[in-house]
Regions:
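Alpha/beta-hydrolase active-site loop
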Residues: 1-25
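Alpha/beta-hydrolase fold nucleophile elbow
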Residues: 25-36
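Hydrolase active-site cap/lid region
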Residues: 43-87
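The feature captures the conserved acid-bearing segment of alpha/beta-hydrolase catalytic domains
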Residues: 70-126, 132
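C-terminal catalytic histidine-bearing segment of alpha/beta-hydrolase fold enzymes
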Residues: 128, 135-179
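Glycine-rich nucleophile elbow surrounding the catalytic serine of serine-hydrolase chemistry
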Residues: 34-46
Length: 179
């Protein structure tokens, strides 16, 4: 549990260093794309770095712990944790690596939220909850729903749909961004 926190913190710091490097090379507009648990990390990085003005989050959840606890792909992790910790405590411990507490820090950033209608790894109710959280905070995200599951997103034709939605959004958002 602690290593997960440390690994996520390190990923956000590495992203910040990458943005430092891009800015030092003259880039003025920075967008970030994260997929699956990487979407949590991308949102954390964007929430903590004002230079990231565009973010595309591909497979989403407001809570890191809920994905691990309820997702089909991480059932083995839950099995290893059950009896030692419950979801409420795990959610509290992993709150610093969860998107929900940082939603207010997304103000002024252009965002695309993508989820898969039949996702069993990132349960759909969690994805819809994050979309609603963004909307309740008046963040006006673009939303795209894939007609597939989590891993089938990587197979044609769903990978084409996903890629098209991501590239179209990033291209448009970075072109019109004047930060």
């Amino acid at each position: 549990i602690g290593r997960t926190l440390q690994a996520c913190r390190q990923a956000v710091l590495d992203t910040k260093r990458t943005v430092d490097w891009l800015v030092s090379r003259g880039y003025e507009k920075v967008g970030l794309l994260g997929t699956s648990l990487g979407s949590c990390l991308a949102m954390l990085a964007a929430a903590h770095d004002s230079r990231i003005s565009v973010v595309a989050l591909n497979h989403i959840s407001p809570f890191f712990a809920d994905v691990v606890w309820d997702g089909l792909s991480t059932a083995h992790v839950r099995t290893g944790l059950e009896g030692a910790i419950d979801l409420d405590l795990l959610r509290q411990i992993w709150l610093p690596i969860s998107p929900r507490p940082f939603i207010d820090r997304m103000k002024g950033k252009k965002s695309l939220l993508i989820y898969a209608r039949y996702d069993l790894s990132f349960p759909v109710q969690l994805s819809k909850q994050l979309v609603n959280d963004f909307r309740q905070h008046d963040l006006k995200p673009e939303v795209f729903v894939l007609p597939c599951g989590h891993y089938t997103t990587g197979k044609a034709p769903f990978s084409w749909l996903d890629g098209f939605a991501l590239v179209r959004f990033l291209r448009r958002a970075l072109r019109s961004d004047h930060h």
